[in-house]
């Protein structure tokens, strides 16, 4: 299982071409990579995406799982509603979110914002909003799966622990 990763690392230490000529460059490829502005911008965007989706997605999923762990009416319907985006094909989700983020007032999000006097935004075209829009879509897409995982964990906590916590005054 580790061979492909180590072989790729080994290959990265060479400069190659299509004719099989291999020149040892050591860490030169990595030095060149760290000077490439496109790579650095991509690295920064990846960091923003991860920081914008992982903590928010986990906190939101844990909160919803906590709410769904309570004895409420129609619990199966709520679970289905939250899990449905995860099993929906990515193409369908992309089409729906493109419609939501449409640039003019025909977009659902811009239509709602116009009710509050906020001018339409180009959500996917404006660099200051595009990352936010993609993070929001990604959080929504994976929320159901994360809720199911957290809910399974919460439901496996023995009732005695809840009783002990209540006796100890935990809220």
Model segments located where?
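A structural signal for multi-pass alpha-helical bundles of membrane permease subunits
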Residues: 1-171
């Amino acid at each position: 299982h580790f061979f492909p990763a180590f072989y790729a690392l080994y290959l990265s230490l060479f400069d190659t071409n299509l004719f099989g000529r291999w020149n040892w460059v050591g860490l030169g490829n990595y030095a060149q990579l760290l000077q490439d502005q496109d790579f650095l911008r991509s690295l920064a965007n990846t960091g923003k995406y991860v920081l914008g989706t992982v903590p928010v997605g986990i906190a939101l999923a844990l909160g919803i799982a906590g709410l769904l762990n309570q004895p409420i009416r129609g619990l199966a319907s709520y679970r289905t509603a939250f899990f449905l985006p995860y099993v929906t094909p990515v193409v369908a989700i992309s089409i729906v979110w493109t419609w939501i983020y449409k640039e003019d007032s025909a977009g659902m999000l811009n239509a709602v914002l116009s009710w509050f006097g906020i001018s339409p935004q180009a959500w996917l075209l404006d660099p200051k909003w595009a990352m936010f829009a993609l993070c929001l879509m990604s959080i929504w897409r994976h929320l159901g799966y994360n809720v199911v995982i957290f809910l399974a964990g919460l439901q496996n906590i023995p009732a005695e622990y809840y009783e002990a916590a209540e006796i100890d005054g935990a809220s």
